[in-house]
């Protein structure tokens, strides 16, 4: 059966390239979009946080705020109103979504030189710590209350594109880099990793997904179009690999059922697609429908928890879309 395209329910265009989007945890029909714009004349990187009301399944822009360029953001599991943002200037910042059409700046934490890009971040389950991966190949863990760096590792030769806590054991942290390395750290063992795999991936590792229902299994994505399922107890050989036809920039967990884990795949130059990973992680089934309306570099996506309405955004065409996989 051939794949079929999906028509968007609503579309809007941001002022600057869009690279991350997530629905609010407080107002679940409000979508937050982050943007990144490099000013070629000054070489400065600018960003905006944009809020959309999607209540009627239509994108209605209700707020935007200037800031440094944004590469990633995540909601806190400790306080649903708090958003942590990774910037292009060596720092992370925190905002509160207390009112429907407004984000309020709380504080910033400087963790590196202003030339270093914060590429990815992830909260610990407690929400008390934040892991950050950076363009200089380093990965670190910040104590949020104090702003102190608790652990720092340098195991990647190039950009550390992504980092993700193990949801089976929060002492463990994974990172993926442009050097095609997948690395695991244990916070109880400072200064060195516990394993570093360069066999599984043949291009940059850009996404990692771990969830409590996964047990010891994780899913990863790479630039070179492949998604893998892995058993972290025997990391060198994938349980299953699938060519998804586009760089697997993000993997967003949607739900777990009796038979499978439902995941949204953000596939860079190919678009976005709903995926189903079998509960034993031995197979990946891609939906026969794929969202291809983004013209260039789909980098962000999320789903609305109330009804599953999907939102995605793309970089060069500055496009935000709402759509359904039905």
UniProtKB/Swiss-Prot annotation:
InterPro entries, alphabetized: Apc4-like_WD40_dom, Diphthine_MTase, WD40/YVTN_repeat-like_dom_sf, WD40_repeat_dom_sf, WD40_rpt
E.C. numbers: 3.1.1.97
WD repeats: 65-105, 113-152, 155-195, 293-326
Localization, UniProt: Cytoplasm; Nucleus
Listed pathway(s): Protein modification; peptidyl-diphthamide biosynthesis
One GO molecular-function entry: diphthine methylesterase activity
Pfam family, one: WD40
Keyword Ligase: no
Annotated keywords: Cytoplasm, Hydrolase, Nucleus, Repeat, WD repeat
Superkingdom in the source lineage: Eukaryota
GO CC, one annotated term: cytoplasm
Catalytic activity, as annotated: diphthine methyl ester-[translation elongation factor 2] + H2O = diphthine-[translation elongation factor 2] + methanol + H(+)
GO biological process, one term: endocytic recycling
Protein family (similarity comment): Belongs to the DPH7 family.
Function per UniProt: Catalyzes the demethylation of diphthine methyl ester to form diphthine, an intermediate in diphthamide biosynthesis, a post-translational modification of histidine which occurs in translation elongation factor 2 (eft201 and eft202).
Protein name according to UniProt: Diphthine methyltransferase
Taxonomic path: Eukaryota, Fungi, Dikarya, Ascomycota, Taphrinomycotina
Gene behind the chain: rrt2
């Amino acid at each position: 059966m051939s794949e079929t395209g999906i028509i968007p329910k609503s579309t809007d265009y941001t002022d600057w390239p869009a690279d991350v989007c997530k629905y609010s945890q407080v107002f679940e029909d409000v979508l937050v979009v982050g943007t990144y714009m490099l000013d070629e004349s000054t070489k400065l990187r600018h960003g905006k946080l944009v809020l959309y009301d999607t209540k009627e399944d239509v994108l209605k822009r209700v707020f935007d705020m200037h800031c440094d360029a944004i590469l990633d953001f995540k909601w806190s599991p400790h306080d649903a109103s708090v958003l942590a943002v990774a910037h292009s200037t060596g720092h992370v910042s925190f905002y509160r979504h207390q009112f429907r059409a407004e984000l309020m700046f709380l504080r910033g934490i400087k963790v590196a030189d202003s030339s270093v890009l914060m590429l990815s971040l992830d909260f610990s389950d407690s929400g008390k710590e934040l892991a950050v991966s950076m363009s200089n190949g380093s990965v670190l863990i910040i104590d949020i209350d104090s702003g102190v760096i608790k652990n720092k590792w340098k195991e990647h030769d190039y950009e550390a594109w992504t980092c993700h806590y193990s949801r089976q054991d929060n002492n463990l942290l994974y990172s993926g880099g442009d050097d095609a390395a997948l690395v695991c750290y244990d916070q109880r063992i400072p200064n060195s990793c516990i394993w570093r795999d360069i066999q599984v991936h043949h291009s940059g590792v850009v996404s990692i997904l771990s969830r409590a229902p996964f047990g010891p299994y994780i899913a990863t994505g790479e630039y070179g179009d492949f998604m893998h399922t892995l058993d972290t107890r025997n990391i060198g050989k994938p349980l299953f690999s699938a060519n998804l036809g586009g760089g697997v920039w993000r993997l967003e967990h949607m739900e777990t059922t009796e038979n499978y884990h439902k995941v949204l795949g953000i596939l860079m130059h190919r678009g976005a697609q709903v995926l189903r990973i079998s509960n034993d992680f031995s197979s990946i089934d891609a939906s026969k429908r794929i969202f291809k309306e983004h013209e260039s570099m789909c980098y962000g996506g999320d789903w609305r928890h109330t009804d599953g309405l999907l939102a995605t955004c793309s970089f060069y065409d500055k496009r935000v879309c709402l759509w359904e996989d039905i």
